[in-house]
Amino acid sequence: MKCPNCHKNGSRVVDSRPADNGHAIRRRRECEQCGYRFTTFERVEVTPLLVIKKNGTREEFQREKLLRGIVRAAEKRPVGIDEITEIVDKVENKLRSVGGTEVSSQLIGEYVMKILADVDEVAYIRYASVYREFKDMHAFADELRELMDREENNSKD
């Protein structure tokens, strides 16, 4: 690695320790030419995940955008920010574990709704109403019936 002081190659690692909650390694280095000490960080390179939107366009996955959508759906509900962050973590981990670099917005929505249905039914319905773009009351009522049927089946188990 080039020294930021003398720009010569060759440095030795003086100290290494975990950083960024274990997601990086902080290394103190010393230039073998001039003795200058400097710090470097080593991180895993995460492949960007592209979201294929309904209209066919692609955009980079934005964790914050997903978080905002779930926060909006769970507004004034007994769902804390830690629980919402955990939902976002689960969805993002699931998307990355599927492999590949592209995922449809539909799949993201399905993952979120599956988790939200178990966390808070009102937040689920709010999220579904935006995600599924209900055209009329019948479509909305069908979704409610599906949720109620699922709840009934779960209580029988």
Swiss-Prot record:
The cofactor required is: Zn(2+)
> What keywords does the record list, in alphabetical order?
ATP-binding, DNA-binding, Metal-binding, Nucleotide-binding, Repressor, Transcription, Transcription regulation, Zinc, Zinc-finger
State the InterPro entries in the record: ATP-cone_dom, NrdR-like_N, RNR_NrdR-like
UniProt keyword annotation of Zinc present: yes
Residue intervals of the ATP-cone domain: 49-139
Q: Which GO BP terms apply?
A: negative regulation of DNA-templated transcription
Zn finger spans (unnamed): 3-34
> Which Gene Ontology molecular-function terms are recorded?
ATP binding; DNA binding; zinc ion binding
| Cofactor: binding details | Binds 1 zinc ion.
Q: Where is this region: Disordered?
A: 1-21
Q: Which family does it belong to?
A: Belongs to the NrdR family.
Q: What does this protein do?
A: Negatively regulates transcription of bacterial ribonucleotide reductase nrd genes and operons by binding to NrdR-boxes.
Q: Which HAMAP family match?
A: NrdR
Protein name stated in the entry: Transcriptional repressor NrdR
Organism (species): Ligilactobacillus salivarius (strain UCC118) (Lactobacillus salivarius)
Its taxonomic path starts at: Bacteria, Bacillati, Bacillota, Bacilli, Lactobacillales
